[in-house]
Amino acid sequence: MDRLIEIAYKEIGTLESPLNSNKTKYGKWFGFDGVAWCGMFVSWCYAFAGKPLPNIGFKKGFAGCQTAVAYFKKKGWITTKPVSGDIIFFDWNNDGRYDHTGIFVCWNINGTFTSIEGNTSLTNQSNGGQVMKRVRQNKNCIFVHPNIVYV
C-alpha cells in the first residue's frame, strides 16, 4: 500500500474549485462532480495506485459512505487492526450513519491515528473542500481492509 499512501500524500492541499462548489478532479474522473467527494477521493487514490475498488454503486468505486459501509460489511472486510492504506469511515454523531471517509496512514503513539481525507478542513469534518492530513481519535469510526485480489 506504499504507492497508495504516496499518491494520497501528493494530493494534500488540493482544493475544490470554485470554493464551496464540491467540484474537483476526483468528481470529474468519477463522473459525478459537484457533490460531496470524500468517497470519490478514496476511490481515485486506489485506482491511481493500481488497486481499483470494486463497483460499489458506481463503476469506479464508491461515492456514498452508507452504501460503501454496507458493501464492505457484507464482504467481511471490517477490521479492528487497520494497516496503512486501509479505508476509514467516520460516524460523527454516533447514530449508525457514516458521514465521511478517508485513508488510514498510521497509529500515533498517543492512540490517535493519522489519515488522509478529501473534502475536509480544520473547521468542517466532512464538507471542508480540501485534501488534508488529519489526526483523529479512534472513536465512532470503522476500518476496512479491502481484501481484493488483483490478477
Locations of regions flagged by a protein language model:
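N-terminal capping segments
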Residues: 1-55, 148-150
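...with weaker cross-activation on analogous glycine-rich loops/strands in unrelated enzymes
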Residues: 5, 51-125
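Solvent-exposed, flexible loop/coil residues
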Residues: 23, 30, 66, 135, ...
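Active-site signature of cysteine proteases
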Residues: 111-151
